[in-house]
Design a protein with these regions (language model features):
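Long, acidic, intrinsically disordered low-complexity segments
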Residues: 34-59, 73-107, 187-203
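Residues that act as N-cap/strand-start positions at coil-to-secondary-structure junctions
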Residues: 62, 219-220, 274, 318-320, ...
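CBM-like, beta-strand-rich accessory domains located in the C-terminal region of large
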Residues: 2, 142, 377-584
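Aromatic-lined, polymer-binding surfaces characteristic
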Residues: 90-270
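Residues that flank catalytic or metal-binding motifs in active/ligand-binding sites
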Residues: 97, 194, 322, 354, ...
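Carbohydrate-active enzyme catalytic cores, enriched for enzymes
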Residues: 228-371, 427
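Extreme N-terminal leader/anchor segments
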Residues: 1-78
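Short strand-coil-strand connectors
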Residues: 71, 327-331, 361, 395, ...
Length: 584
């Protein structure tokens, strides 16, 4: 896949900008220079933000016993400080240093857990707060400030004057450091969360009112940059919306509690994002697996949705975010119909253009592989590739090109997408049975092929007819001797039991409630192969995928269908698969 001159120039500018911010951040984080952010003045806490994230009181006893189980790794401290231990993974270190686990101690809410929380904070101040720079990365720092402010009433209850001064002095120092360096973090959600943390501090701490106007202005600018008109996030990661609202809703409450009018941009962002939470949900309450989504935090999602006063039907068209949704009967279909996000915000984006997910009642049928909750880096490269999605792969290549480089990964905090689909066209027909037709040019530079996908969901939701077709970049038919080989993949949810039909052109899908769905196609090469569903709540799970193989000119279009059959009586045999129909 070739990279255009414009894309090369943009990449060079981004690398230069990120390198500059990295150098500046490193200089400011140097222990010999960090004294600039110290102050002899001790501020006072005026109010604490609400923490909407779910807490588990049973985790408090583990932490008290020195057993720190984060991100799938366990460290037993054996009377040593956890901040002196060698982290078993970066994810474990981020969780420890961000103090998100303080909420579990608060949930237990006893004199012992309060004392334990103060001891651990004291240890961090001794070990990390002065001379060790690992806890001063901007994304970690932002989350720690929010957590310390949110849990301050719990932590400071019964605390002596010495700890109170020490706590506030350290918190003030961290806020000053963040104020100076917030723009040195990478673009996207991390930068927005840094600015949100600054606004939390401005509203919660005495002596910060002079920074209110500037912090609010930065918040407004970043919200307008990152929250799209249809409510999606500019990174195209649906999971970012849950995390964003979990921080924005308490921020709006803080403005009201301080008798200040929340910025209109804040209210607008919340109002736009809230309906998108329903847009991305399947019938079982989980999010569709697009562009970096892992296991859905269903408890947090339910908490956030409780603030939605409208509770209306989700929108069906999100053109700015690049997604489409069809609801019919008890079925829901979501499709990725957008190009990759801007290069500087594409570290988590996937090469899944025109992939779709489908659910029936409380069951997910067709899915993408998603990402696991822990050990993401071990799976990220595989999960982002096109074959991990329910769409078409040509010549076993992804429709996007990732810039795989250790130095780039360290600089950008991930692997950006440097080229991919740019011309993604969508036609939507809502009269009668809802129909979508979309195409993308992600394979034009490598294969000279435009992929078009059309899907039609019956009005009762019991039949999905689809067609994948291939043309040249000018829309002309491909020659019969075209050499590009395609694989049309349909990854199935691990709860689905699948078996091939005797004729080899179909697959029977058995759901938990004994509902039957039949996949059918006229293509000769239909396989049922192993797959993995990475986004399971209990970790990666084995599953299967339906794969149709062929060559783009032979044929130039492949029709397929999923059809529902009522629950089978004991001993009954399923009907023979019907020929796919596509009334387009």
């Amino acid at each position: 896949m070739r990279v255009s001159v414009a894309e090369r120039a943009r990449l060079s500018v981004l690398i230069g900008r990120r390198a500059f911010h990295s150098v500046v951040g490193g200089i400011n984080a140097h222990p010999l220079l960090r004294w600039r952010f110290a102050s002899t003045k001790t501020d006072r806490l005026l109010i604490a933000p609400q923490d909407l994230r779910t807490a588990d009181a049973t985790r408090a006893s583990e932490i008290y016993a020195g057993r720190f189980a984060f991100a799938g790794k366990v460290v037993i401290c054996d009377r040593r400080s956890p901040f002196e231990m060698t982290p078993p993974s970066d994810e474990w270190a981020v969780t420890l240093l961000s103090f998100v686990w303080l909420r579990h101690l608060r949930a237990a809410d006893s004199a012992i857990t309060r004392s334990n929380a103060r001891s651990l904070i004291d240890e961090w101040i001794n070990v990390q707060g002065g001379w060790n720079s690992s806890g001063w990365r901007i994304d970690i720092l932002s989350r720690r400030i929010i957590c310390w402010l949110s849990q301050a009433p719990f932590v400071l209850q019964d605390a002596d004057a010495r700890f109170y001064r020490r706590f506030i002095r350290s918190l003030s120092r961290q806020v000053r450091y963040l104020r100076r360096n917030a723009n040195d973090t990478r673009e996207g959600l991390p930068r927005l969360q840094a600015i949100i943390a600054l606004n939390y501090a401005t509203l919660c701490m005495q002596g910060q009112s002079g920074y209110l106007r500037g912090n609010v202005r930065r918040l407004i600018e970043e919200l307008r940059r990152q929250v799209l008109p249809d409510g999606g996030h500019v990174s195209r990661n649906p999971g970012a919306l849950i995390e964003l609202l979990a921080d924005l809703l308490p921020l709006r409450q803080l403005f009201s509690a301080r008798q200040l009018q929340p910025p209109q941009a804040l209210n607008n962002a919340i109002d736009r994002v809230m309906p998108m939470l329903r847009f991305f949900r399947h019938g079982d309450g989980n999010f569709a697996q697009f562009n970096g989504v892992g296991p859905t935090p269903v408890d947090l999602l339910a908490t956030v949705l409780a603030y939605d006063d409208a509770r209306g039907t989700p929108v069906s068209n999100a053109p700015h975010s690049g997604y489409q949704r069809i609801d019919a009967g008890q079925a829901a279909l979501l499709m990725d119909t957008g190009p990759p996000p801007p290069m500087e915000m594409s570290q988590e984006a996937h090469a899944g253009c025109l992939s779709f997910e489908m659910s029936w009642k409380q069951h997910r049928l067709v899915v993408n592989c998603g990402l696991p909750a822990v050990n993401k880096e071990n799976w990220r490269q595989v999960a982002r590739a096109t074959p991990a999605h329910s769409t078409v792969t040509l010549n076993d290549r992804s429709s996007c090109r990732f810039l795989e480089s250790l130095s780039i990964r360290q600089l950008f905090g991930g692997t950006p997408i440097i080229s991919g689909p740019r011309d993604v066209r969508i036609e939507r027909e809502s009269s009668g049975a809802p129909t979508l037709r979309a195409s993308h040019d992600g394979y034009v530079s490598d294969c000279g092929v435009v992929h078009t996908r059309a899907v039609n969901l019956s009005a009762d939701g019991r039949a999905l007819d689809g067609e994948d077709s291939f043309t040249g970049p000018d829309g002309q038919p491909l020659p019969a001797d075209a050499t590009a080989e395609f694989a049309i993949r349909f990854h199935l949810h691990p709860a689905i039991k699948a078996s091939r039909l005797a004729d080899g052109r179909g697959v029977i899908l058995l759901l938990h409630d004994r509902d039957l769905w039949t996949f059918a196609t006229l293509a000769d090469a239909v396989e049922l192969e192993e797959s993995v569903f990475l986004a399971g709540s209990d970790g990666p799970r084995r599953t299967v995928q339906i794969v149709i193989y062929g060559r783009v000119g032979q044929p130039s279009a492949v029709r397929w269908s999923f059809r529902h059959t009522p629950p089978a009586a004991p001993g009954a045999r399923p009907d023979r698969a019907q020929e796919p129909e596509l009334p387009l």
